[in-house]
């Protein structure tokens, strides 16, 4: 698929603005305004878990036969109507000791009662203070959903059917798709555990989840706009990537080569209007031609990667480029190996939140892919990935626990970003994010391991310049103050944090 314009006519932005029912200004780069929603290419896919590859296959096969019958005692609870909070108190105030006979004799003046009131007040203040601290610093004390889901996963691994049934019943009582982050995590986790224990048809009928591939085009468009407005989850990495591209081009301002960007990402075009606008405002002007080659693998069920059928941002992005007098070409490929490069262009690769889906244990597909990228001789590579601990995917319970940590940060942050309790946009983003719980092959890794892979592939890390760092910090001030960016290792590592816990990282390589 190829879209190209060689002689851009004079045209205003009215056609772009009228296409949008809404707009959002993120100012990802100093002086520029990203107000244009882009479309995604056609495509949808399904994923089916292969139970025969799981170490607990024997137990699961026998247990799933009785799963429906086992739920007779639990199925009366509707996930949507649970409103009472779970009776989990991790910071209980100390009990007040009853006075003995001698103390009662001295209590006629109310002294003891006053002391009891003071103790009770102090206990309440202590509990509130502890709760606030837990919420602020990301402490796990208040995260009760994981304390139910993780033991259930361990019970599945141990083939302990009675404990599995116990935890599933408790979770079904507490889970809710419209409650707080704990209740929603309980609901998504419960669904994932059921999926692991039974066929996908049974688990999906238990509680339907909305994803990008099943969304209507207008709803998908509206959701992307809203998410970029309320969360830096992808907005900040996109910002850093665009700044890195400009940084690379600025190192040789007299270079008049074309710019070729390989997009291995999940932005659905949201990233590029700001970059195009920045290119048009350079003193030396934009490159003679800008090529964007999108690697769109519709066969991989990677969270956030595949939009709804009929969603195509190509024509809208071309129209925007024409208005800026930029000669833009967009190509879509399904394999990295099919890329056509030229010595007369500056090749830059943007790999964002897609490579962690590749295998990394027996067959190191991640390392092989990075070596394939190196063989293209790019002028720069921007790598943005989830920054999380890795655990062997062969251990279901350990891998599930790490995925729960990732999903908790997403759900907790969307609770702050989306103020409406039943926001449809939030449900769509969360449904897409929590696909990771159902995907046996989707494993994160820490930035140290990714840095090791990049060096083994022949890349050298490069520091972000001051403008890139300042632009990222300026963008982050638009969001909840629990978000922060940490620059480490001589500004070669930009880490996005939520309540002090690592979410993702962005890095630049040459």
From Swiss-Prot:
Domain GRAS as annotated: residue spans: 136-510
Subcellular location as annotated: Nucleus
Motif window: VHIID: 259-263
Biased composition (Basic and acidic residues): 102-111, 129-142
Positions of region (Leucine repeat I (LRI)): 143-205
Keywords on record: Nucleus, Transcription, Transcription regulation
Biological process annotations from GO: hormone biosynthetic process; regulation of DNA-templated transcription; regulation of secondary shoot formation
Tissue-specificity statement: Expressed in seedlings, roots and flowers.
Region of interest (PFYRE), residue spans: 347-435
Stretches with biased composition (Basic residues): 119-128
GO CC terms in record: nucleus
Region (VHIID): 224-294
Segments for region (SAW): 438-510
Region of interest: Leucine repeat II (LRII): 312-337
Region (Disordered): 90-142
Pfam families from the UniProt entry: GRAS
GO molecular function, one term: DNA-binding transcription factor activity
Function: Probable transcription factor involved in plant development.
Family: Belongs to the GRAS family.
Identification of the protein by name: Scarecrow-like protein 29
Origin species: Arabidopsis thaliana
């Amino acid at each position: 698929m190829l879209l190209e314009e060689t002689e851009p006519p004079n045209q205003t932005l009215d056609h772009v603005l009228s296409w949008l029912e809404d707009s959002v200004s993120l100012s990802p780069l100093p002086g520029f305004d990203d107000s244009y929603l882009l479309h995604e290419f056609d495509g949808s896919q399904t994923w089916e878990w292969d139970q025969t590859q799981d170490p607990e296959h024997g137990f699961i096969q026998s247990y799933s036969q009785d799963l429906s019958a086992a739920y007779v005692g639990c199925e009366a609870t509707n996930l949507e109507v649970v409103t009472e909070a779970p009776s989990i108190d991790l910071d209980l105030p100390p009990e007040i000791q009853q006075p003995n006979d001698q103390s009662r004799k001295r209590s006629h003046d109310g002294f003891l009662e006053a002391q009891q009131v003071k103790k009770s007040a102090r206990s309440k203040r202590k509990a509130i203070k502890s709760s606030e601290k837990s919420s602020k610093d990301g402490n796990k004390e208040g995260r009760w959903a994981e304390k139910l889901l993780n033991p259930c996963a361990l019970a599945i691994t141990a083939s302990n059917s009675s404990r599995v049934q116990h935890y599933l019943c408790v979770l079904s009582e507490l889970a809710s798709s419209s409650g707080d982050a704990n209740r929603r995590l309980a609901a998504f986790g419960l669904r994932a555990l059921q999926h692991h224990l039974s066929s996908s048809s049974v688990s999906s009928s238990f509680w339907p989840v909305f994803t990008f591939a099943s969304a209507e085009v207008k709803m998908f468009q509206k959701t992307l706009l809203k998410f970029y407005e309320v969360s830096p989850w992808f907005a900040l990495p996109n910002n850093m990537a665009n700044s890195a591209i400009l940084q690379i081009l600025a190192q040789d301002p007299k270079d008049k080569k074309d710019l070729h960007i390989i997009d291995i990402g999940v932005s659905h075009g949201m990233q590029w209007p700001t970059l195009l606008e920045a290119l048009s405002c350079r003193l030396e002007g934009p490159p003679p031609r800008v090529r964007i080659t999108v690697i769109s693998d519709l066969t991989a069920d990677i969270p956030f990667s595949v939009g709804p059928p009929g969603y195509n941002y190509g024509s809208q992005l071309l129209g925007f480029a024409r208005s800026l007098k930029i000669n833009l070409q967009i190509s879509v490929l399904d394999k990295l190996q099919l890329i056509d490069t030229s010595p007369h262009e500056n090749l830059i690769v943007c790999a964002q939140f897609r490579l962690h889906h590749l295998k990394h244990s027996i067959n190191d597909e991640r390392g092989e892919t990075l070596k394939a990228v190196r063989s293209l001789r790019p002028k720069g590579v921007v790598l943005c990935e989830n920054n999380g601990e890795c655990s062997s995917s062969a251990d279901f319970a350990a891998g599930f626990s790490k995925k729960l940590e990732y999903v908790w940060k997403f759900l907790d942050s969307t609770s702050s970003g989306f103020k409406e309790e039943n926001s449809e946009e939030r449900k769509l983003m969360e449904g897409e994010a929590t696909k990771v719980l159902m995907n046996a092959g989707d494993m994160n890794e820490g930035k140290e391991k990714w840095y090791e892979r990049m060096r083994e592939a022949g890349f050298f890390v490069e520091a972000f310049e001051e403008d890139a760092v300042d632009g990222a910090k300026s963008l982050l001030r638009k969001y909840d103050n629990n978000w922060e960016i940490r620059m480490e290792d001589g500004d070669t590592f930009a880490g996005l944090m939520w309540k002090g816990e690592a979410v993702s990282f962005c890095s630049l390589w040459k």
